[in-house]
Amino acid sequence: MPEAVQTQDQPMEEEVETFAFQAEIAQLMSLIINTFYSNKEIFLRELISNSSDALDKIRYESLTDPSKLDSGKDLKINLIPNKHDRTLTIVDTGIGMTKADLVNNLGTIAKSGTKAFMEALQAGADISMIGQFGVGSYSAYLVAEKVTVITKHNDDEQYAWESSAGGSFTVRLDNGEPLGRGTKVILHLKEDQTEYLEERRIKEIVKKHSQFIGYPIRLFVEKERDKEVSDDEAEEKEEEKEEKEEKTEDKPEIEDVGSDEEEEKKDGDKKKKKKIKEKYIDEEELNKTKPIWTRNPDDITNEEYGEFYKSLTNDWEDHLAVKHFSVEGQLEFRALLFVPRRAPFDLFENRKKKNNIKLYVRRVFIMDNCEELIPEYLNFMRGVVDSEDLPLNISREMLQQSKILKVIRKNLVKKCLELFTELAEDKENYKKFYEQFSKNIKLGIHEDSQNRKKLSELLRYYTSASGDEMVSLKDYCTRMKENQKHVYYITGETKDQVANSAFVERLRKHGLEVIYMIEPIDEYCVQQLKEFEGKTLVSVTKEGLELPEDEEEKKKQEEKKAKFENLCKIMKDILEKKVEKVVVSNRLVTSPCCIVTSTYGWTANMERIMKAQALRDNSTMGYMAAKKHLEINPDHSIIETLRQKAEADKNDKSVKDLVILLYETALLSSGFSLEDPQTHANRIYRMIKLGLGIDEDDTAAEEASPAVTEEMPPLEGDDDTSRMEEVD
């Protein structure tokens, strides 16, 4: 037996090859070893997860070729702490690694996540995120000073990898105890990390992190028990003791702890009895809980769901809501879906994997980034789907064509929407959900025509009547006026901006509620959401706004149109191509004018959003953004005085300047940007000068900026000062 150990540790014949760690890996290991982390326990979670992945792989291969399991049918993970040697060993009967795998996976080829993880660590990220970056195996160095990996793959010999993390590692052929197939990771623990050899501590970590691993995790602990034997037996045991020293892991070992007093206690005609301590190996399965999604939902507590959610997602917070269901009939599958408490910071990044639902087929893990399983707008959902009908050896290409998967997807979307609707009944929790995932709901309305109606019921908005509460479209409809035919909304940047907008003046005066849409995605959402419960959605910033009015109001409006028809024509001539038309408004109360867009063009807000796109299409910008209509308020003193001025002398130069000033100011107040802000600013400065009584021909001003004075649009001189004051 000692010879075998010697061969394993220092093989005489086999050559030992030494390799250097790839620079990034060496850097990562140095970071792990030299930094203090409070939660070092995650090393065990990572190593058990790696074992589970290796077992998944061999099980997956055996489905098409059962002979792959001839080297060991029992799929399991064993944990063996050894206090005497200060080692913790993790053994699995997974797929194992070839020599090439060992060299590549454990040292010479950096995973894509290595650099990203180091950057995250240096930025203050938690070490427990290591598994998400594909470098979990290096977490062993949180607790170990040396790591030995012995592995056997069906297609190769048994090899041993070893490193003390000094920048290099060795690989050699291993002649030790044959594994059959699988991997044995031996951690030679640091002096101050012996807590991880304690039975209680190992159980605690496995329960916390690896309870739902699909393979049995067995813990082997050496224990002692009292046993009564006769004197003769005790002597025999003493003689055998030395021979058995090497076999303590496999057979009980006995040591004499009998005392003289015990020897004196005899039963007349019976032989002397002796009490001895017997060592034995206690084996205990740590994860008897079967996969939670296969159990009856009525038997599962919220705490169990919470534990499973955390083990599935590595989230530190509890989930917000859960949906556990099974579908039976022509198609059978079980699913467990979770809504997280908060959205990840990179939720809408293109490079991010598109979903987080793990796909299992008959309890065998297949993949965790199957894009066909759930639409992109639901990519924040977490969970598992376990199908009974998909073939186990299904490829990505086959999945894309699979009708079964399309049915599963349809059911998952349906159940997600059911879950959100249930969540909406709890105002407090729905508020948390909506703050995090409202963009996803709106994206769904834009993309998913089939479920648009259900998704629209989940929308919540501030309105002119809701105060600080967000309300649903259904709530809005129940509060509509008797003669109101439309749902009115306005889009903009902030709640205050839209609430003070000129567009909502008359509606608010008439007590008509207006929905405030203040997220950029709302613009895309309402392009697709044309109506709600038979009521058309109407933007108050677009032309042709129909407000409920009686015959008398209609008659008055017609009279005003006739009265201001001439002014509208003059203003259109002055503004030329800047606007499509100038009309009398029915939406203004306190503002003199506003700019509205055509029914099918972009709103001012949409134009702003599109201008901000780095890859925008300028040709689209041209025809979508050009249709502007100027609406004037016939009841406003500025417009009335301007009408009188224009009718008195339509060639009056100040009229032209005032019209342009009104137009540019209306552009700004309506949410558009100015093409030439400097010219507008100069006009305003001249108005200020007139207001302050400063002589326009002031020579000092001319000397200061002669060029600007020349370029400035003409405002009439002193003769017109009184006229300007009239307009004010």
From Swiss-Prot:
Compartment(s) of residence: Cytoplasm; Melanosome
Alphabetized InterPro entries for the sequence: HATPase_C_sf, Heat_shock_protein_90_CS, HSP90_C, Hsp90_fam, Hsp90_N, Ribosomal_Su5_D2-typ_SF
Binding locations of ATP: N50, D92, K111, R396
Superkingdom of source: Eukaryota
Keywords, in A-Z order: ATP-binding, Chaperone, Cytoplasm, Nucleotide-binding, Phosphoprotein, Stress response
Annotated segments matching region Required for homodimerization: 678-728
Sequence segments annotated as region (Disordered): 226-274, 698-728
Biological processes annotated in GO: cellular response to heat; positive regulation of cell cycle G2/M phase transition; positive regulation of cell population proliferation; positive regulation of nitric oxide biosynthetic process; protein folding; protein stabilization; response to antibiotic; response to cold
Keyword field contains ATP-binding: yes
A GO MF label: nitric-oxide synthase regulator activity
GO cellular component: axon; cell surface; cytoplasm; cytosol; melanosome; myelin sheath; neuronal cell body; nucleus
Regulation: In the resting state, through the dimerization of its C-terminal domain, HSP90 forms a homodimer which is defined as the open conformation. Upon ATP-binding, the N-terminal domain undergoes significant conformational changes and comes in contact to form an active closed conformation. After HSP90 finishes its chaperoning tasks of assisting the proper folding, stabilization and activation of client proteins under the active state, ATP molecule is hydrolyzed to ADP which then dissociates from HSP90 and directs the protein back to the resting state.
Motif (TPR repeat-binding): 719-728
A Pfam family that the UniProt record links to this protein: HATPase_c_3
Amino acid composition bias (Acidic residues), ranges on this chain: 229-243, 252-264
Domain comment as written in the entry: The TPR repeat-binding motif mediates interaction with TPR repeat-containing proteins.
HAMAP family with a match to the protein in the record: HSP90
Function recorded in the entry: Molecular chaperone that promotes the maturation, structural maintenance and proper regulation of specific target proteins involved for instance in cell cycle control and signal transduction. Undergoes a functional cycle that is linked to its ATPase activity which is essential for its chaperone activity. This cycle probably induces conformational changes in the client proteins, thereby causing their activation. Interacts dynamically with various co-chaperones that modulate its substrate recognition, ATPase cycle and chaperone function.
Family the entry assigns: Belongs to the heat shock protein 90 family.
PANTHER family recorded: HEAT SHOCK PROTEIN 90 FAMILY MEMBER
Record's subunit section: Homodimer.
Protein's name according to its UniProt entry: Heat shock protein HSP 90-alpha
Source organism (scientific name): Gallus gallus (Chicken)
